[in-house]
Amino acid sequence: MAAASTLKNMALCLTLVCLVCSAVVGAAYVVTVDPIAAAAQAKTTASIAAVLPEFSGTPEQGSVEWNGAKYNYYKADGAGYAIISSTSGFGGVLTLMVGVAEDGTIHNTTVLSHSETPGLGAKCTTDEHFMSQFRGFDPAAKTLSVKKDGGDLDAITASTITSRAYALAVSNAVAVFHELTDGGQGDE
């Protein structure tokens, strides 16, 4: 004869199922945590190399608070700063790494993460005309905003909000660069 279904039996079964599921999730975390961290570090290293002129050695890592937000940066002697800058785009947070040369010009930019609309705002990672506008851009001589707002940058077609967010992230990185080089403070 089968045991009567009681509250005690149901609670015991549910507890066992939860323990097994928790063990599986915990094991998956232990197995994947190091490869995920290594992949993130490799992406950061590749991004630093992509946004700064060629340099030797390992960049110094630091952070600085500017305008109420924390900015992580990497300083490569003789090459400039690679600064991680985030803003809100159309679909969510847009995070860039911006390479600012020692003379204050933008060497290059790259998108670290975004949640923009595929085929529209996501073109900020593939639209070569849009991305090339930032290479060699001198914020001291030009306005770092889209033409629709009186600036010198062409927006991505049908993605003005993303283009504005991208320009703002780059502009913020330039401001952080000046904070660091003009007597500001970072935790180097």
Model-derived features: positions:
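Flexible, solvent-exposed loop/hinge segments and secondary-structure transition points
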Residues: 2-188
